[in-house]
A protein has these predicted regions:
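ABC transporter nucleotide-binding domain
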Residues: 183-271
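Primarily ABC-family ATPase nucleotide-binding module
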Residues: 3-14
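ABC transporter nucleotide-binding domains
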Residues: 13-16, 23-217, 223
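C-terminal coupling/interaction segments
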Residues: 2-5, 271-316
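Short, flexible helix/strand-to-coil boundary loops that buttress conserved ligand/catalytic motifs
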Residues: 83, 234, 307
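A structural detector for beta-sheet-dominated domains
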Residues: 19, 39, 242-244, 269-271, ...
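Structural motif
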Residues: 94, 254-257, 287
Length: 316
């Protein structure tokens, strides 16, 4: 089996297009007229709370479930079973042949995607080495820890060198060292030109690696675009402050939405339109400042504000 040859756009131009994609289960609308354009060579974050519709949208892209309406195109071509083979997919529900040896497992899965056997075996060896699992190559999958099995499935997703990869909660259950290892590998694959859809609820990780994001709430895209533009559209700011003697600021400071204690300092989230410098006179009432630092909004703050606006019926 060979993958179809795609007429790929230049890096940065749209490789995957979703137009008015919808899916309902009875009265529940899992995807509501989803429209997306994902740039080639980017890491594109699918973000949203549990049950928001991220996995449903991914399963529609992978043709695991069929949409009720809308269309999907990959590199300008309708997404079919054949063109879908140009997409690697790591689902949230992991699945490996537990009685197969690690090397045999990866080799077999690469062959299923059209990689010749000799090349498939070489790629499998390289991936096992990259993941620090070379000494486990001849061990059965069921003898590996859960985290090690997850790394095997990660390798299986990339081993056929697909044009696009979809990772659904790839870091779930991993320790910090393995999260860092896979994060670095995701960035390496991006550097090779691979387009990566990164579906997660771990906003701090998305903030580290995503070039662009979409935020899904109730099956609907409520926010999307390059991460820097999204930040610019949400001027929500915070300042980190500390005083000599570590006093506690009052909860009703003018221009402050909420406060949060962090070690010996306080993080103050500002109301929209408030200039951090405007706070200084009120803050200095509590004593000499030892720290005053303005911060850009975090992805978590943007997420919370966007969801709150959507639920109030205010466009983001």
């Amino acid at each position: 089996m060979t993958r179809p040859t795609l007429d790929l756009p230049p890096v940065g131009e749209t490789i995957l297009t979703l137009e008015s994609v919808s899916k309902s289960y009875g009265s529940v609308r899992a995807a509501r007229d989803v429209n997306l354009e994902i740039p080639r060579g980017s890491i594109y974050g699918f973000l949203g709370p549990n049950g928001a519709g991220k996995t449903t949208t991914i399963r529609i892209i992978m043709k695991i479930i069929m949409a009720d309406g809308g269309s999907i195109r990959l590199a300008g071509r309708p997404l079919t079973g054949a063109t879908r083979d140009s997409i690697g997919y790591l689902p949230e529900e992991r699945g490996l042949y537990r009685k197969m040896k690690c090397l045999d497992q990866l080799t077999y899965l690469a062959e299923l995607k059209g990689v010749p056997r000799a090349e498939a075996k070489q790629r499998s060896d390289r991936w096992l080495t990259r993941l620090g699992l070379a000494e486990w190559r001849d061990r059965k999958v069921d003898s590996l820890s859960k985290g090690m099995q997850q790394k095997i499935q990660f390798a299986a997703t990339f081993i056929s060198e697909p044009e696009m990869v979809i990772l659904d909660e790839v870091f779930s259950g991993l320790d910090p060292l393995n999260i860092e290892l896979l994060r670095d590998m995701i960035l390496e694959e991006k550097a090779k030109g691979t387009t990566i859809i990164f579906s997660t609820h771990m906003l701090a990780e998305a903030e580290k690696i995503c070039d662009a994001i979409c935020l899904i709430e109730g099956g609907e895209i409520i926010l999307d675009g390059p991460l820097e533009k999204v930040r610019a559209d949400f001027p929500l700011q915070s300042v980190r402050v500390a005083w000599e003697g570590n006093p506690e600021p009052p909860a009703d400071l003018p221009g402050v939405l909420h406060r949060e204690k962090s070690d010996s300092s306080w993080r103050l989230t500002l109301a929209e339109g408030v200039n951090p410098r405007e706070l200084l006179p009120d803050l200095m009432v509590f004593g000499p400042l030892t720290l005053f630092s303005a911060n850009r909004p975090s992805l978590s703050e943007i997420f919370l504000e966007a969801v709150a606006r959507h639920r109030r019926g205010v466009p983001s």
